[in-house]
């Protein structure tokens, strides 16, 4: 995680002089919390927010959005699965976007995860009449103002899909950019755990019922 933060600092300095990095520790049992604390002491523009217990991927994202003060928010996971240098490509689309989501050029995962992701995206296209290529990636660029127009309810990994779907249904400009992904260098993925799959399905059904009213 430390390497990813240093990489992020390098990239952000190329983009703007005024920025902040917000890390949300969602009750993580690993050493990310102590690493984050050390980094906040070294860099004034880094802050860490702790959840006392694990509230879920979606809850962590909502916390980050709540405390962000910037006009544009680049959200990415802390396991280095995504290249923070993609931000340099994402910002080229800001003039014509309210939200920029990403899709994977090639999915470097095991077969079961690829199948789950494929089925997931097919279901979302069918239920919500969207044509997104891949709505489940954890890297996106969000215009802060859109949070005044949409309310996110999901605490599960469905949060990314909810953000894109609600934005689209509100008539906001949502664009996509292809990216490469890499093997995790920190932590372990939990999005495809049985518990998170059930929570994702639950949040998906809730959003479907809300939108179809």
Predicted regions, residues:
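Residue-level preference for short helical/loop micro-motifs built around acidic side chains
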Residues: 2-3, 30-34, 59, 134
């Amino acid at each position: 995680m430390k390497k990813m933060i240093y990489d992020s600092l390098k990239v952000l300095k190329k983009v703007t002089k005024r920025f902040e990095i917000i890390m949300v520790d969602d009750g993580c049992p690993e050493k990310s919390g102590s690493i984050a604390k050390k980094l906040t002491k070294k860099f004034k523009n880094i802050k860490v927010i702790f959840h006392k217990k694990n509230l879920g991927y979606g809850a962590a994202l909502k916390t980050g959005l709540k405390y962000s003060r910037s006009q544009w928010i680049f959200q990415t996971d802390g396991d280095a699965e995504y290249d923070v240098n993609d931000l340099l490509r994402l910002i080229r689309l800001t003039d014509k976007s309210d939200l920029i989501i990403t899709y994977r050029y090639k999915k470097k995962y095991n077969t079961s995860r690829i199948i789950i992701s494929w089925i997931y995206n097919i279901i979302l296209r069918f239920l919500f009449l969207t044509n997104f290529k891949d709505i489940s990636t954890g890297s996106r660029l969000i215009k802060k103002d859109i949070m005044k127009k949409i309310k996110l309810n999901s605490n599960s990994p469905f949060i990314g899909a909810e953000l894109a779907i609600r934005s689209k249904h509100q008539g906001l400009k949502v664009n996509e950019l292809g990216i490469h992904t890499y093997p995790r260098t920190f932590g372990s993925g939990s999005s495809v755990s049985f518990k998170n799959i059930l929570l994702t399905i639950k949040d998906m059904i809730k959003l479907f019922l809300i939108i179809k009213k």
